Amino acid sequence: MKRVLSAAVLLPLVLIVFILGNTYVVDVFMGIVALRCIYELFHAFEQKGHHPVRWVGYLAAIAIMFIHVIPEHYAKYAVISIIPISVLILFILVLTKKTKTDVIDIAITFFGVCYIVLFLMFMSIIINMENGKFLIWYVFIASWLTDVFAYLTGKAIGKHHFTDISPNKTIEGCIGGTLGATLCIILYTVLINKFAGFNINVAVISLIGIILSIVGQIGDLSASAIKRYAGIKDYSDLIPGHGGMVDRVDSVIFIAPFTYLLFILMF
């Protein structure tokens, strides 16, 4: 019941932000999501005695809120510069011995900036593309409906265990999730082709749907692998019935950059 109630609150919020909100609203929303995710990720690693540099991750997450405030020409350089600037700051901290940070902590902090901030930043990039208001829903369809169909298929016919990283996942569930999400992506494409004037090739979008669904499941398992390493069940109890923010967007984190890349390459 908690899971359903949480979804009933979160779904309208996402719909409002991504349908009614402009680019800047989406940027702020994704920046807040990234901030929470960075907090949860670093907290997970701290359970194993690591000391990631939180403020570097927080600053990188806040940067998402401003990527469309500055002129586009300069924004590209700002995005590219996040990684080298972050690494430089981290090594300065180690070399000057100002904190407990060591090389492993640098790697974890750098990983957090890439995994959370840069990957989620593609949500803001997609929404700012031509027809981005329509394209962004491929991310959500691939993420949400893979989860839904994987759960339903696994419950109905799941017999073969998939991986120890996530004991409840079955091979049948994974396949069912991909097939169900891909069919929904095809249906969405047919609808926007007919009613919004798009001309997206259904065969190509079918391939993209399969890839995005698989990538999303890898994202889910990757987040689970980190939890397993940290010895935690959920990243937090922020969202009743769902766990933390990372638990809720783990597949979106992986799907977003691949959605952008595949649409750039194939259309």
Label each PLM-derived region with a short phrase.
Residues 145-155, 216-228:
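Short helical (or helix-break) motifs at transmembrane helix termini and adjacent helical loops
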Residues 1-210:
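Membrane-embedded alpha-helical bundles of polytopic integral membrane proteins
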Residues 228-251:
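Interfacial loop-to-transmembrane junctions
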Residues 261-267:
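Juxtamembrane boundary at the C-terminal end of a transmembrane helix
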Residues 177, 248-252, 267:
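A short, conserved beta-to-alpha structural element at the edge of catalytic cores
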Residues 213-218, 245-253:
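Hydrophobic transmembrane alpha-helical segments of multi-pass transport and channel proteins
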